[in-house]
């Protein structure tokens, strides 16, 4: 890997994706960027959660997001094949984590306002970034063949982040607030 972290290649709005030169506002590049942003936010959340099991779950999600990003990159570079793909077992792992975390928080009967201690707040923000990443991937389905497990995985991830934020709030003794509308 080069020691220089700039090339000047992107100074005019293009980037390199494998062997392809593409515009930075390309829909695939946008989706990859949203997944990358989510990964960064999970890193911040992980450093701010008080629960070791939740932190380990976030580290797992971060690694899996690289698999999602690789799958998206392969849409534009046909010479690149990801070493791993998101599959039904990955989705099942998230569903189990959602069920386990949901069992530790009260049943939800109203909308919940985002926030709480920093760990929960970062998880709430990560959830919204996950939803945006999911929408940007859905937007690719009209032009590209997307692994259906990626779509399901991204949907479940935002659900898990919501439940984890609620769990952290409960663990920290923060009462949920509900919108008045």
What are these regions (language model features)?
Residues 1-181:
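Phosphate/pyrophosphate-binding loop motifs in nucleotide- or prenyl diphosphate-using proteins
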């Amino acid at each position: 890997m080069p020691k220089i972290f700039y090339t000047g290649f992107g100074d005019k709005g293009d980037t390199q994706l494998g062997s392809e030169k593409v515009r930075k506002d390309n829909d695939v590049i946008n989706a990859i960027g949203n997944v990358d942003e989510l990964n960064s936010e999970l890193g911040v959340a992980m450093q701010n959660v008080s629960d070791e099991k939740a932190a380990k779950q976030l580290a797992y999600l971060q690694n899996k997001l690289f698999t999602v990003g690789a799958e998206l990159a392969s849409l534009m570079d046909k010479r690149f094949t990801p070493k791993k793909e998101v599959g039904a077992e990955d989705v099942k792992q998230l569903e189990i984590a959602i069920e386990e975390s949901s069992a530790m928080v009260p049943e939800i009967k109203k909308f919940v306002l985002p926030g709480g201690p920093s760990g929960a707040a970062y998880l709430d923000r990560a959830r919204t970034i996950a939803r945006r990443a999911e929408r940007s991937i859905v937007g690719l389905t009209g032009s590209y063949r997307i692994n259906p497990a990626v779509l399901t995985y991204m949907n479940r991830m935002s659900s898990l982040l919501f439940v984890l934020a609620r769990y952290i709030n409960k663990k920290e003794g923060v009462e949920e607030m509900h919108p008045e509308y």
